């Protein structure tokens, strides 16, 4: 008689095969990618921070240090607020006034009266600019007027002829020292 063989073959389903072989392999690959990214992040933060102490930290400490570093960078980027054009102009005007004052003080033939007159004039003009800027700011914050009578919806031909007959004063332009 022939030896009896166990004809029962074990069938492995795809799910069982996945759980046994593929899942651990995919998990190792995922962890390898994460570790590679963490190492790259660690070197980048150490490079930008200029501190090699982060290279000796464990993963959790390194991630915390990276978060702190990124938050500092965001705060630094938000801090510099561009100055308003008028503020920039005021700063330039004051620099020009101080330069004029320095030059006049160093000029031996310059009389004191002329220097006082020039500096007084520059101060008066600066005050006038500040007042004009305050008026302009209050006008822009109030309700905007229509650009023309026609755009308001209450336009008549009589208003047009009256406004052409009476000339309006032209607004003075802002004096600039250059």
UniProtKB/Swiss-Prot annotation:
What positions does the domain Orange occupy?
A: 89-122
Motif: WRPW motif; annotated at: 175-178
Q: Where is the bHLH domain?
A: 18-73
Biological process (GO), any one: nervous system development
Note whether Repressor occurs among the keywords: yes
Task: Kindly state one GO CC term assigned in the UniProt record.
Answer: nucleus
- Cite the effect that the entry attributes to residue 169 to Q: In strain: NVIII-46 and NVIII-24
Q: Which Gene3D superfamilies match?
A: Helix-loop-helix DNA-binding domain
Q: Alphabetically list the UniProt keywords.
A: Developmental protein, Differentiation, DNA-binding, Neurogenesis, Nucleus, Repressor, Transcription, Transcription regulation
Q: Which domain of life is it from?
A: Eukaryota
Q: Which InterPro entries match?
A: bHLH_dom (IPR011598), HES_HEY (IPR050370), HLH_DNA-bd_sf (IPR036638), Orange_dom (IPR003650)
Protein's cellular compartments: Nucleus
In this chain, composition skew of type Polar residues spans: 135-165
Q: What is the effect of changing residue 2 to V?
A: In strain: Nv2001_f0696, NVIII-46 and NVIII-24
Domain description: The orange domain and the basic helix-loop-helix motif mediate repression of specific transcriptional activators, such as basic helix-loop-helix protein dimers.
Q: What is the designated name of this protein? A: Enhancer of split m5 protein
Quote the gene name from the UniProt entry. Answer: E(spl)m5-HLH
